[in-house]
Amino acid sequence: MLDRLFNAGETEVALAKKLGIERTLIVPGNADFQDRVYEEMGEKLSSALNLLLPLGHSIVTILGGAALARSAKYLSPDLANNRQLEFVPGRGALGENVETQSNTIVQEMAAKTSGTYKTLYLPEQVSDDAYKSLIRESSIADVLQDISQSDAVIHGIGLAQEMAQRRGYNSIKLSELREKRAVTECFGCFFDEHGKVVDRITQVGLQFENLYKIPHIFAFACGARKAQAIKAYMPNAPHQTWLITDEGASNMILKGK
């Protein structure tokens, strides 16, 4: 039914089957060289949300990322028709690039869809003791409650070394990640090319183990340089995941590179 509604092409069907997920949406081009890809991915995301989100009050959890940050402004105001959308960040701020933080993206998405948003201003990476203390704070607990009741999650898929550097890994930790052959990072977990978790950070926000409870999940990643990272993460992705990507990444994955 969903394939018919979205006129799924052979490539999209083949990619979803290869990755073991519900659906893929592929836009033309390669984001490594063509900025227009982000506009089309934003429009695809908007159409998918319009199809899948329930009417009335809907909560959408957002995890930051460069691709999603560049596509957020292309959400359609039509999403607000018969909906009261609430956008919440899925994790604390990285503190490096404000534009790609989930706190910034939720504000832009809410503005585009006449929705509301909440923020989570705290370090993304914390100690175990600090985590136990923080989640008891009323303002933080309120956001975490919304996350647990989300109708949809939209997340990126990061390159392991890049994400580790943003999280302040020192040279020793970066070297250890290379030795463990970490390829990708998602939800604070670092995965090798086979999808095995080789490292993990304690973060406040959406926990990977709880992702399976969310009705609709959108993985948002593009460009040929992300192909290996996408492929490495997908063995862990819940089946209800939709991947929104471009030809640059999809062609590399299907060719087995």
Task: Give the label of every model feature segment.
Residues 76-78, 169-175, 232-239:
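Short, solvent-exposed amphipathic alpha-helical segments in soluble enzyme
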Residues 60-71, 95, 159-161, 223-226:
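Gly/Ser/Thr-rich loops at beta-strand to alpha-helix junctions
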Residues 1-10:
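N-terminal helix-turn-helix DNA-binding module of bacterial transcription factors
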Residues 166-196:
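Gly/Ser/Thr-rich active-site loops/lids in small-molecule metabolic enzymes
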